[in-house]
Amino acid sequence: MRLILFLFALCPALFAASQPNFLLVMADDMGFSDLGCYGSEIETPHLDKLAAGGLRFSQFYNTAKCHSSRVSLLSGRWSRQAGDESLQRAVILPEVLAPAGYFTAMTGKWHLRKQPTDFGFQRYFGHLSGATNYFAGDQTFRLNGQPFAVPETGFYTTIANVDHALKFIAEARAAKKPWFHYIAFNAPHAPLQPLEQDFKKYQGRYDIGWDAIRAARVAKQKQIGLLPADSAESPRPDHIPAWTKLSAGQRSDESRLMSAYAGLIDRIDQEMGRLIAELEKAGDLDNTVILFVSDNGACPFHRGGATPNTEPYHATTRWGDSTGWAWARNSPFRFYKQNQFEGGISTPAILHWPAGLKQKPGSVVSSPAHLVDVLPTFAELAGAKVPTSYPDRQPSPLAGVSLAPIIAGGQMEARPPIHLLFSTDRGLRDGEWKLVSFQSGPWELYHMPTDRAELHDVAAQHPDIVQRMAKRWHDMTANVLTTQGKEAQPVATAATAKLNPGWSHYDDTVPTQTKSKANGKKKPAQAASALPRARKDTQLSVSGPQLILHSTGTDPGLAFERLAIETPGPYTLEFRLQSKSSGPAELYWTTDPETILPKGKHLDFEVKHDGEWHEMKLRMDEAKTLHALRLDPCGGEGEVKIEGLMLKAPDGKVLAKWP
């Protein structure tokens, strides 16, 4: 096998007839246990069949975040090392495979700079945005570099992605070329908009709640050999109540929410089945390497839940995520998307290749692997060379290693440490050990062969290992990722609560318009004075009367969603601000529950980034009642402190204040 791969590398053109096709598929916000072959009750027979005839990875890692996982997947490098969304320090998969004779195409979510056709994809259909309406799309849809008008009726993104994939693959087949096709489904990312039949298929199945579903998933994971029979699962965290503690109305709405998730995942499987059937019919399936992965674990951020007066299968309905169900979907692990604990970074990975796989079909691979390994693996199997230089870019060295030895029936050699970083969540996987920090909190150390659920922090017992791994993390951060600022600073020494203001607040929150069956009274989705959600590039902490924002990028801010405001405007937002950041400041708002900011109304305002305190009064000339706010106090990296933040009515009455 190694000799063949060596010959491929010497002269790829001579072996064109033997080169495999590549079908790379990425789901969005899929939890570790969301597929049947990973423990789920959701019906995914086609993906389960791929797993039965191929490999499942039990320790396949991502970056815990949408865009950075896509960078690592396509580039074979850590996201910061590759230049993040710009890809300025990388050469990506289609640019590697096309010179080896491959027809390259993509369908689905891009979420990076420019367009796929600017980075070697010869064909592209999909949306450039990070999320889209499943039925109506958005203005970023493109077809081969040109704007694509989404049809007003009969359109659904998951289906459209496979429709165009089949067209592009047929085009490659007609040209008698091996092909590389990348499908990036936006499912099951919010807004949760399943097709009607897919939603109704699961209605009522989740009335038993997240405690029972998680227990059943963990039991199945052990039964199918994904987890050792004696492995422990993480307990339900304090920030999630027992299912029985929810009101009857909450239980009803949360059950419907999970039915929407299940419908989205079921549809991915149905469309994968349609695609696989066409490959088999054309005689392509045996020599096609299919790799199915996810960009991060299940999402915990509550952005509007199910409501009793709406159904999710309409373009005008936008249900959001649930922390309780994210916990269940990431079984048996802790935490979620954006965190570097296993719940955020360990997700399903299925590899299927009948013509080349030498492992026993149905095997579970326990060797740690990462999205950065995909490019070197595909390049080796294709006999393609990875360029060390490229016009107008400065490619950095690859971070990943080839998984070809595993495919060939062998074992992985010792790999370099897996570097983990998103914002101030960080970690390092090095052999049997994992070092991890929650939002710059103290380093925690876990022995992964005996503690995958990260229940027993042994940092105090092994200070030498912590010191060695922490030094390695900082060395990689500075010298490989060239990361500076707060993300690269030493971690704290005092422990803090592991909480995020964007997670569901079940103690004071029920989904919009939910009526408790106990008393029939309407309750708001969110108390107006609940903590705002930290947006992208933002870490939020509270110190006494102050909201402290740590901006790590160019689009920071705070989101105030589903406000329980009944008094009509105009409104005034008052606060004191001290900024050590830079860039423009903006305020967005909407009175429409269906409008997702930054769509809506907008106000630019001036901030002096001089480290001094300044009084701010922002007027919103709005006669209707306010539904949501977004406050962006800066546009660059640095710290911003806000205190005395309050929303006032026309008569000066305080309608809400934060914290």
Which positions does each model-derived feature cover?
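Exposed low-complexity, polar/acidic, P/S/T/G-rich flexible segments that act as propeptides
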Residues: 637-656
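Extracellular beta-strand-rich recognition modules
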Residues: 627-633
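Bacterial N-terminal signal peptides
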Residues: 4-13
